[in-house]
Amino acid sequence: FVRHKVCSSKEMDLLTPLGELVEVNGHNMSVYTEGTGDKTFVFMSGSGTCSPILDFKSLYSLLSNEYKIAVVEKFGYGFSDVVDKNRDIDTILSETRMALDKAGIEPPYVLCPHSMSGLEALYWAQKYPEEVEAIVGLDMAVPDYYDEMNINIPIMRLGQYCAGLGITRCLPSLAESDAIKSGTLSQ
C-alpha cells in the first residue's frame, strides 16, 4: 500500500492533460480534439474507462486524417474533475453538450458510443435530432440490455478496493499486455 501511494504521487507529477480543460458547471472537463474534416466524430466512453482519450486513441488516430475527432472525458474520467453530483442521463448529456460547445465543437456529430454510453447516444438522438448525424456503436449497450443486466456489485467493489491498495500493480499480465505496450490489440 505504501509503495503504491509513493508511486502514485510520483506518477501524478508526470501527468499533463492531453486535451483542453473547459469549465462546465464550475468544474473542469477535459475535451480532446484532433484532425480536420467536414464530419465530427464524438467518442463516448462507457463505465470504468480510466482515460477515454487514451482508450480510443488506436481508433481515432486512424480517422483523424479525414475527420475531426472529439473525445469528452465525463466528470470522474481521465483529466476531468471528480464531482459529487447527480449522474443521471439528463445531467451527463447536458454536461457533454456544454463541454463540446465551450470547446468550439459544433454539431452535427457522428456519435461513437462505447458500452453504457450507448444509452446516452440514443437519448441524445431522440432529444436533439438536429445535432446527431449518425451513431456508430462501439459494442454499445441498448435499452434491452438493462432488462437482463446483472452487475455483481460486490466483485466490482472488490476490484475498486484492490486497485486503491495498489494490488493491480502486482499483476504483470495487466501491465504488460499487448494493448498497453502498443496501444492496440492488432495491426
Label each region the model flagged.
Residues 27-79:
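Conserved HGGG/HGGXW glycine-rich cap/lid loop of the alpha/beta-hydrolase fold
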Residues 89, 131-187:
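Flexible "cap/lid" subdomain of the alpha/beta-hydrolase fold that forms the substrate-access gate
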Residues 74-112:
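Active-site loop/oxyanion-hole signature of alpha/beta-hydrolase fold enzymes
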Residues 106-150:
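Conserved hydrolase catalytic core segment
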